[in-house]
Amino acid sequence: MFEIAKKYMPGGVNSPVRAFKSVEMEPIFVKSAKKSKLIDINNKEYIDYIQSWGALILGHAHEEVVEEIKKQAELGTSYGLCHELEVEMARLIVKHIPSVEMVRMVNSGTEAVMSAIRLARAYTNRELIVKFEGCYHGHSDGLLVKAGSGALTFGTPSSKGVTEKIVSNTLVARYNDIESVKELFDKYGENIACVIVEPVAGNMGVVLPKQGFLEGLREITKEYGSLLIFDEVITGFRVSINGAQGYYNVFPDITTLGKIIGGGLPVGAYGGRKEIMELISPQGPVYQAGTLSGNPLTLAAGIKTIKIIENDPDFYSKLDELGKYFEEGIVSALGDFDVKINRIKSMLSFFFSKQEVDSYEKVINSDVEIYKKLFKCLFENGILLPPSPFESLFISSSHTKEDIEKTVYYFEKFSKKLKEGKV
């Protein structure tokens, strides 16, 4: 199938990481997926820790979500006009994401970030933006500068086709290094429109913010009249129902969302303070539009997902317990090796490294060759990790202790083979 795919699609895929190139393998083609498992076209079953790159916090094909999609499909798949689900989704986002007073729906995280930055520039009447090494904010030109995720593996610090003129307005600081931010503001502060950051980096693997880092960003941006943008495409409704901002109690001016709020369908959103959001067309001068923005199928799935979370007061604590169980199992299995695990709730990464991994530099200096061997070993035994050492693992509410135990068993088998020099 891959050979056929390569005839019609660049590299045979629609997103680079799916090619499995980083682990020196060919991709699988999925036939179906349910709960924590997926089945490929050869009828091989896998326990899936990709979960659509974090979009499926309830797992694949959750019965209630699927039913909502079916019901909405009977009523129409797209209107290109206003409908009640848009209002309900906006209400839920404003209810749960502390810094958001108004929100605009779009179709992807990339689109949300593009729009948020345009809005920040309009609000501040400034041009420069600050991003961080290893943080990925989609594939828009101005942000493909030392980007994380797929660009860590396949790109150079700036992708071909991105001109120097476009990226000349993008300043790059070091994640978890507040002094590097202060240096940029000392030099360019009066011209910086915004700082955009993943509050928990999730696209160079999971890298948690050091104590005081997010607070420092909030303080500096306020001092200079710049806006702080949290890219919560991954962390929104993942680390808590209030996102990372609620978890860390640091509140940005603008938030971008995606993944979970679409219930597994294409989605994006950006929101913030009312005075900022009212600059968006048709109320204000900042133009942004989309034929499929606020798509009813997507919003039906997303609303149902959020309501399922709302109705279970123990939802996140149960996910955290599973995440902790998985983390402890990996530590036990790989205890004879230099491995560092970064986890927050139901997203985690492990790095083969002698030092704590809290920066882009330490991420890229970890041993990716061991990860490739681990990926292949687990893959052969029906365990699907992300096909890149620079991506996060995601646990859904459909994963079970039995799933975790089976996975840890094969971690142990790999550890034994590695010690014996058999991989």
Curated annotation (Swiss-Prot):
InterPro entries in the cross-refs: 4pyrrol_synth_GluAld_NH2Trfase, Aminotrans_3, Aminotrans_3_PPA_site, PyrdxlP-dep_Trfase, PyrdxlP-dep_Trfase_major, PyrdxlP-dep_Trfase_small
Pathway: Porphyrin-containing compound metabolism; protoporphyrin-IX biosynthesis; 5-aminolevulinate from L-glutamyl-tRNA(Glu): step 2/2
Main subcellular location of this protein, as a coarse class: cytoplasm
MF GO annotations: glutamate-1-semialdehyde 2,1-aminomutase activity; pyridoxal phosphate binding; transaminase activity
UniProt keyword annotation of Thylakoid present: no
Localization in the cell: Cytoplasm
Entry coiled-coil feature ranges: none
UniProt KW keywords: Cytoplasm, Isomerase, Porphyrin biosynthesis, Pyridoxal phosphate
Protein name: Glutamate-1-semialdehyde 2,1-aminomutase
